[in-house]
């Protein structure tokens, strides 16, 4: 019930089927998209915030359908599936620019999130993916350029689409922004911001961890056998890496 109530709250602030700005608190505006992005990316741009949040809503509906299945509430499955599909179509219709082959502001998360949740039609996927590669190379100089929301989204997409070389090419960059930039500047834990502002022990960018054991290590969970009772071993090889060592501790 609580998850359904939260979805009801989100729907309360939806207009024409799309989630829009909801009320701020005295502390701050909590209708955020990506957060703690590198300098030069406007995380306050409404177009980016809306495509990110509505893509997240698709994830919520898809997850609720899975939960309903696990709980044996078969009557709830199809309504959530339909809501997810309806929102997928709205996202593409509203935020996609067919001339630019791009979504919203064209940042990495704006391009990847719709692809990840299934909002991008199959026939458009190659074009959007090529836009992503071009934007990463030209606008972002080959760097992973996202915040705490974008990093796990990009990571999940890279794992599912076996884009190990693309991800590795970004991770090995030593200049700002990047993980090696942190290490080269004395970091022993991940920072709150890519440039080192504020906290130097934060969980903002830890979503990258998934890539190491699911892509390089290739240990993928089986949703039909939860709790790692059954796994798939499908390592994604990167040409310039000579070895990877990984182990899974299950309980």
Describe each PLM feature range.
Residues 1, 55-74, 112-123, 153-161, ...:
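Well-ordered alpha-helical scaffold segments within catalytic/enzyme domains
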Residues 1-53, 70-116, 123, 173, ...:
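Active-site acid/base region of carbohydrate-active enzymes
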Residues 20-50, 97-119, 149, 153-159, ...:
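Carbohydrate-binding/catalytic loop surfaces
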Residues 65, 92-93, 134-137, 176:
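Amphipathic alpha-helical segments of tetratricopeptide repeats
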Residues 81-82, 165-251:
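Non-catalytic C-terminal accessory modules of carbohydrate-active enzymes
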Residues 124-136:
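Alpha-helical repeat scaffolds
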Residues 139-185:
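Repeat-solenoid scaffold signature
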């Amino acid at each position: 019930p609580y998850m359904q109530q939260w979805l009801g709250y989100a729907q309360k602030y939806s207009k024409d089927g799309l989630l829009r700005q909801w009320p701020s608190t005295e502390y701050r505006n909590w209708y955020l998209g990506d957060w703690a992005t590198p300098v030069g990316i406007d995380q306050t741009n409404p177009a980016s915030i809306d495509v990110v949040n509505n893509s997240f809503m698709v994830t919520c509906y898809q997850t609720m359908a899975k939960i309903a299945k696990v709980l044996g509430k078969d009557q709830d499955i199809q309504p959530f599936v339909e809501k997810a599909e309806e929102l997928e179509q709205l996202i593409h219709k509203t935020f996609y620019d067919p001339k630019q082959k791009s979504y919203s502001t064209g940042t990495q998360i704006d391009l990847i999130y719709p692809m990840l949740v299934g909002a991008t039609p199959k026939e458009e996927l190659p074009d959007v993916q090529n836009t992503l590669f071009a934007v990463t190379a030209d606008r972002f100089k080959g760097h992973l350029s996202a915040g705490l929301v974008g990093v796990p989204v990009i990571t999940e997409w890279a794992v599912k689409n076996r884009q190990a070389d693309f991800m590795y090419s970004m991770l090995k960059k030593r200049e700002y922004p990047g993980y090696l930039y942190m290490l080269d500047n004395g970091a022993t834990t991940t920072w709150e911001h890519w440039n080192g502002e504020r906290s130097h022990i934060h969980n903002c960018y830890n979503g990258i961890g998934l890539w190491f054991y699911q892509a390089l290590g290739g240990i993928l969970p089986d949703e039909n056998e939860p709790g790692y009772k059954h796994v798939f071993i499908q390592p994604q090889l990167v040409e310039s890496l000579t070895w990877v060592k990984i182990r899974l501790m299950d309980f």
